[in-house]
Amino acid sequence: MKKDELIKIAKNFSIDGEPIKIEKCNSGHINKTYAITYKTKEDEQKKYILQYVNTNVFPNLPELMTNIKKITKYMNQKATEKGENTDRLTITMIDTLDDNPNSIYNENWRMEEFIDNTKTYLTTESMEILEEAGKAAGKFQKNLDGFPAEELYEIIPKFHYTPNRVNQLREALSSEENNS
């Protein structure tokens, strides 16, 4: 996507400043992701993540965003009550100017604050990195303790239902055997 098109899209979000730099993030395989640096009125630079959400995987962005907002609000409130720092605990979503993520050219775009000093790993053989990933997943689960899951939308039906996933794997293997 061209830089001027991305800037036009980015200007649909509630950010005080002007986009000055755009970099494509090549990690990930579902969504198209860009890092955008803004120059603020205070002449500082602040970085954000602009993401085109793949509608084949996530057809209903408003429901997905509602889930994200509910979960991050819950986790931040819980951490604040414990006196913990919330700066790096969750992502911070940026609202669109009209509070409708589907309104940007009838496509699914979202933006969040960039978390400095982070790194993405698509694969690793490092036991240390795997251990840290496990700790992060465990901490996420612990921070969700008590969250009313029934308030969430089911974004991908039966995605976390293990018997369904096993059946999908068996079907894929069977299909692969039949095509060989």
Protein language model regions, located:
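Juxta-kinase regulatory segment immediately upstream of eukaryotic protein kinase catalytic domains
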Residues: M1-E23, M75
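Conserved ATP-binding subdomain of kinase catalytic cores across diverse folds
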Residues: K21-N178
